């Protein structure tokens, strides 16, 4: 008796899922703290300069009845944002588009769109972490002295909020500051169990934050766990990584961009022209002419720590 099985015919094949899956992604978050934008730009240029007037010293002395005041000169400072080009692109071939069971063009546009926000958010993260105000672990004089056991403490975050308030840094919603914290560091902050620490506070509330495994708003800071948070690779003692938690108020960062026709505040998706003779090659990419800079150093605090994970 002759059986007809998979070895006798070619109609038995492996199947493919026709929906494409993409690599895991995180949301772009740093752009939100670059809230200063040019609104009355004089002309198109390679940089955008923002002028900031200084406050006058308080006049607390009593005036003499017959003595005129002495005029005081005003002072100012500037923040300069240099515009640079950012972008990326992919190009597909006609043979791929004609033989793939997936919609390659649509998938390429999807991937390019995420690459755009991912890339720009990392640019902003590096600028935010480059501020001059840092809060080191107790007993450490510099980043290079941070050891593996120097995980973040509640005191460091409270110190950051206190310094921002001392500098009159304006807050975001409900007057709270925003803290971009690496997930590894957030784990360490939630692991502390003293009565003045995060987890003890949350347990005394309704416990929802504990169930969610999030910090939320605490100590005047709305913490957002961000995998793009800046890491100083190998910058600590014995080459350990140092993690930066950036705590910011409003006007911490500024964004500049070109206002010329065809440019703008937001990046753009660009479909390239088909220029080969047989029109086989199709490209899609993104482009942005912009720049980011720290606008008010007093509105930024960087908490440095190691991670136990």
Task: Describe each model-derived feature in a short phrase.
Residues 1-82, 300, 304:
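N-terminal "assembly arms/tails" that initiate or stabilize quaternary assembly
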Residues 2-33, 147-158, 191-309:
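Sequence/fold signature of self-assembling virion shell proteins
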Residues 47, 174-178, 281:
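Short, surface-exposed beta-edge/turn micro-motifs
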Residues 57-61, 188-189, 232-233:
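Short, solvent-exposed loop/turn elements at domain surfaces
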Residues 73-100:
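Short acidic, glycine/tyrosine-flanked loop/strand segments centered on an H-E-D-like triad
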Residues 94, 181-185, 193, 288:
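Short, structured patches in soluble enzyme cores that scaffold and shape functional sites
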Residues 99-169, 302-304, 308:
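Alpha-helical scaffold segments that mediate packing/assembly in large oligomeric complexes
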Residues 165-182, 187:
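Extended amphipathic alpha-helical segments with heptad-repeat/coiled-coil character used for oligomerization
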């Amino acid at each position: 008796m002759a059986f007809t099985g998979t070895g006798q015919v070619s109609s038995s094949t492996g199947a493919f899922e026709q929906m494409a899956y993409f690599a895991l992604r995180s949301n772009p978050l740093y752009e939100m703290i670059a809230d200063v934008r040019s609104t009355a730009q004089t002309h198109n240029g390679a940089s955008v300069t923002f002028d900031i007037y200084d406050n006058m010293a308080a006049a607390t002395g009593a005036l003499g009845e017959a003595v005129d005041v002495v005029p005081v000169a005003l002072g100012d400072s500037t923040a300069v944002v240099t515009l640079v080009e950012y972008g990326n692109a992919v190009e597909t071939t006609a043979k791929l588009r004609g033989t793939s069971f997936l919609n390659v063009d649509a998938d390429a546009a999807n991937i390019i769109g995420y690459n755009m926000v991912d890339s720009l958010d990392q640019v902003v993260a590096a600028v935010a972490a480059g501020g001059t105000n840092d809060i080191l672990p107790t007993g450490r004089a510099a980043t290079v002295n941070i050891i593996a056991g120097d995980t973040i403490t509640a005191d460091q975050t409270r110190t950051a909020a206190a310094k921002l308030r001392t500098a009159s840094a304006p807050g975001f919603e409900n007057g709270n500051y925003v803290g971009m914290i690496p997930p590894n560091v957030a784990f360490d902050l939630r692991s502390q169990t003293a009565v003045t620490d995060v987890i003890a506070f949350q347990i005394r509330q309704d416990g929802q934050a504990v169930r969610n495994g999030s910090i939320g708003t605490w100590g005047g800071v709305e913490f957002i766990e961000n995998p793009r948070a800046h890491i100083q690779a190998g910058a600590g003692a014995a080459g350990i990584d140092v993690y930066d938690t950036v705590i910011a108020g409003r006007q911490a960062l500024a964004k500049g961009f070109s206002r010329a026709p065809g440019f703008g505040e937001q990046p753009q998706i660009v479909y390239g022209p088909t220029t080969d003779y047989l029109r086989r090659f199709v490209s899609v990419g993104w482009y942005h002419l912009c720049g980011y800079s720290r606008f008010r150093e007093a509105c930024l605090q960087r908490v440095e720590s190691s991670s136990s994970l």
